[in-house]
Amino acid sequence: MRGTPLLLVSLFSLLQDGDCRLANAEEKLMDDLLNKTRYNNLIRPATSSSQLISIRLELSLSQLISVNEREQIMTTSIWLKQEWTDYRLAWNSSCYEGVNILRIPAKRVWLPDIVLYNNADGTYEVSVYTNVIVRSNGSIQWLPPAIYKSACKIEVKHFPFDQQNCTLKFRSWTYDHTEIDMVLKSPTAIMDDFTPSGEWDIVALPGRRTVNPQDPSYVDVTYDFIIKRKPLFYTINLIIPCVLITSLAILVFYLPSDCGEKMTLCISVLLALTFFLLLISKIVPPTSLDIPLIGKYLLFTMVLVTFSIVTTVCVLNVHHRSPSTHTMASWVKECFLHKLPTFLFMKRPGLEVSLVRVPHPSQLHLATADTAATSALGPTSPSNLYGSSMYFVNPVPAAPKSAVSSHTAGLPRDARLRSSGRFREDLQEALEGVSFIAQHLESDDRDQSVIEDWKFVAMVVDRLFLWVFVFVCILGTMGLFLPPLFQIHAPSKDS
């Protein structure tokens, strides 16, 4: 039992001595490798001036932070892994307590100064200079994290069902292809630690090495970020409200022309669509190369609503026509009163208009002129009694037949009627007044019939424009939105 504490103390001392020797070995190795007399971090690690230093690149995407469509900038969080060999940093591990890996501050060793060429904020290099990992064979691995803002040309043609190809172009700032060679370690970027974006889907991340045959000193490595937008946000907040507002324009053709609100509804819908168009202009980049899909749809619907305003003016003009201002042509009657209503599933209710107006029997005695004559001169046939279409008020009861038949039997009908003592001048004036009233009522009924015909023509025109509006709206909406949904966008590449 007494030997146990001594054993523990001995083991602890051995471990501590081992750590001290290892720390001393790493410190000695660091001093030996980075001795200013044998290592200069400004000199390219080449044994001769013609030797190419091969830089192996591999990009790891951590997060697609944002894509600013209006400023055409893509912000990404990436790790750019760089590997190369520096023969001056090789050592024999057996001479340094078996140390095979050494971590050295990045600014104390030679770096290939690879930067993002197409940056958009002036920050070309990485923000954090992490340590480089150096192995005993001289291979160096550097994995600096960086948040890059790169320029990205936004294609707005299919917005919000668009697919973009944004690139990250890496190149050495001071070394050309005669001094270093940039190669891809893997054909695509790594997404092992990728955090999914709520707005974009990653379609592909291919990498490519670009050289210029006409310029032997040029070489770069480019990664294509092929991303596809998730359209749910814009569908809910833009497309569906626009479709619903456009559908309100259909109600314009259902409103009666007498209500006086057709033009108000049309202009209100047009103003709402104009507001959405201004909202779109704040999102997409101000480019004249193409029109975004949602902008095309808004312009299309604005044209339709403007068309509905024009048709509403035409319908109201037809609706308020009268015989005193317009004469209905025969082709208008044939086309809009007989033929078109059948094709538009319209049926005009039958109207039974009578020009005979009969007061209550208890107030007036009604008789025709023939009836008055018959009352004074003798009986007549029932056909003559009801043959006339004109009625008048007779305030005096008919006299008995025997009272007038003796001295008027030999006279003509009109002479007998006028020679009758009961045919007074006021009765003649009453007959003329009643005749005028009857003619006026008949003229009013005839004018009213023409006015009703114009109103029905306006209803037919309204229904015709309704079907035209519905068909054009449906076909236009499908023609605009269906092709981008099923179209496969080919990724564009730089020349």
UniProtKB/Swiss-Prot annotation:
In the brain, it is detected in the medial habenula. In the peripheral nervous system, it is found at least in the adrenal gland. It catalyses: Ca(2+)(in) = Ca(2+)(out); K(+)(in) = K(+)(out); Na(+)(in) = Na(+)(out). The record marks 133, 141 as: Key residue for a low dissociation (K(off)) from the conotoxin BuIA. Disulfide bonds join 152-166. Glycans are attached at residues 35, 92, 137, 165. Residues 21-235, 286-297, 485-495 are extracellular. The record marks 81 as: Key residue that facilitates effective access of the conotoxin BuIA to the channel binding site. It is a multi-pass membrane protein. Na(+) binds at residue 261. Residues 1-20 form the signal peptide. Residues 257-264, 319-463 are cytoplasmic. The chain crosses the membrane at residues 236-256, 265-285, 298-318, 464-484. PROSITE patterns: NEUROTR_ION_CHANNEL (PS00236). Activated by a myriad of ligands such as acetylcholine, cytisine, nicotine, choline and epibatidine. nAChR activity is inhibited by the antagonist alpha-conotoxins BuIA and MII, small disulfide-constrained peptides from cone snails. The heteropentamer CHRNA3:CHRNB4 activity is blocked by the alpha-conotoxin ImI and AuIB. GO terms for cellular component: acetylcholine-gated channel complex; cholinergic synapse; neuron projection; plasma membrane; postsynaptic specialization membrane; protein-containing complex; synapse. Component of neuronal acetylcholine receptors (nAChRs) that function as pentameric, ligand-gated cation channels with high calcium permeability among other activities. nAChRs are excitatory neurotrasnmitter receptors formed by a collection of nAChR subunits known to mediate synaptic transmission in the nervous system and the neuromuscular junction. Each nAchR subunit confers differential attributes to channel properties, including activation, deactivation and desensitization kinetics, pH sensitivity, cation permeability, and binding to allosteric modulators. Belongs to the ligand-gated ion channel (TC 1.A.9) family. Acetylcholine receptor (TC 1.A.9.1) subfamily. Beta-4/CHRNB4 sub-subfamily. This is Neuronal acetylcholine receptor subunit beta-4. It comes from Rattus norvegicus. The gene is Chrnb4.
